[in-house]
């Protein structure tokens, strides 16, 4: 685990974004942990989050031309990542996002920001079922661009309805990498190292044994 990944997990726990206990997921599974990126909800938190995304972008080595934030949650994530890449890594890259509704006045259309062209890095919080990414791929294809990869905050490393995770299905179906700031593997490592949080380790390990990939 890299230093920025350890810092990100600590930061997510401090913000209440990553919590441990008993949570019912949309899938109906009872999970011993929950991740809610919507709680990175202050200016300072968003700025720090962008720096973690930027570190993961650099770490991934993915070659791309433009950042894309899918509406709605991906919009601030793409924006703060673009700022952090420019300020921390001297990489001033274009970014854009889509609207859910087309506008019939002003600039019109469903895309806002830089042109969606060339190699596109999609920025989002998590991939649960992969439905949102499939919709994004249609938008990218319609512009004649191509997806270079997807960057998310947390990879739950968890099977969907079949043997693969939603992330593995996206990688298989679109032939592109999905990378994350951290994965469940690193969360487990962090729990094992933390005297206070170690008590949650057995439940998370049991959950991974049942649903993990």
Curated annotation (Swiss-Prot):
Its cofactor is Mg(2+). Orotate binds at residues 34-35, 128, 156. The keyword Glycosyltransferase applies. It comes from the Bacteria. SUPFAM superfamilies: PRTase-like. It is an enzyme of class 2 (transferase). CDD domains: PRTases_typeI. InterPro entries: OPRT (IPR023031), Or_phspho_trans_dom (IPR004467), PRibTrfase_dom (IPR000836), PRTase-like (IPR029057). Its EC number is 2.4.2.10. Keywords: Glycosyltransferase, Magnesium, Pyrimidine biosynthesis, Transferase. 5-phospho-alpha-D-ribose 1-diphosphate binds at residues 26, 72-73, 99-100, 103, 105, 124-132. GO terms for biological process: 'de novo' pyrimidine nucleobase biosynthetic process; 'de novo' UMP biosynthetic process; pyrimidine nucleotide biosynthetic process; pyrimidine ribonucleoside biosynthetic process. GO terms for cellular component: cytoplasm. It catalyses: orotidine 5'-phosphate + diphosphate = orotate + 5-phospho-alpha-D-ribose 1-diphosphate. Pathway: Pyrimidine metabolism; UMP biosynthesis via de novo pathway; UMP from orotate: step 1/2. Pfam families: Pribosyltran (PF00156). GO terms for molecular function: magnesium ion binding; orotate phosphoribosyltransferase activity. Belongs to the purine/pyrimidine phosphoribosyltransferase family. PyrE subfamily. Homodimer. Catalyzes the transfer of a ribosyl phosphate group from 5-phosphoribose 1-diphosphate to orotate, leading to the formation of orotidine monophosphate (OMP). PANTHER family: OROTATE PHOSPHORIBOSYLTRANSFERASE 1-RELATED. This is Orotate phosphoribosyltransferase. It comes from Pseudomonas aeruginosa (strain ATCC 15692 / DSM 22644 / CIP 104116 / JCM 14847 / LMG 12228 / 1C / PRS 101 / PAO1).
């Amino acid at each position: 685990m890299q230093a920025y990944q350890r810092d990100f997990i600590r930061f997510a726990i401090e913000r209440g974004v990553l919590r441990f206990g008993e949570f019912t997921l949309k899938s109906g599974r009872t999970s011993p942990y929950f991740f809610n990126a919507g709680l990175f909800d202050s200016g300072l938190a968003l700025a720090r989050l962008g720096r973690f995304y930027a570190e993961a972008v650099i770490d991934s080595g993915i070659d791309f031309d433009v950042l894309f934030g899918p509406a709605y949650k991906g919009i601030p994530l793409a924006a703060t990542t673009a700022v952090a890449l420019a300020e921390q890594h001297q990489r001033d890259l274009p970014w854009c996002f889509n609207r859910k509704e087309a506008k019939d006045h002003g600039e019109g259309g469903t895309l806002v920001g830089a042109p969606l062209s060339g190699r596109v890095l999609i920025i989002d919080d998590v991939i649960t079922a992969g439905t949102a990414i499939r919709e994004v791929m249609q938008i990218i294809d319609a512009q004649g661009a191509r997806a270079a990869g997807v960057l998310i905050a947390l990879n739950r490393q968890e099977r969907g309805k079949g043997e693969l995770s939603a992330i593995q299905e996206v990688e298989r179906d679109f032939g592109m990498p999905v990378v994350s700031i951290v994965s469940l593997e690193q969360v487990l490592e962090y729990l094992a190292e933390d005297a206070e949080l170690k008590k949650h380790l057995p439940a998370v390990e049991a959950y991974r044994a049942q649903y993990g990939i």
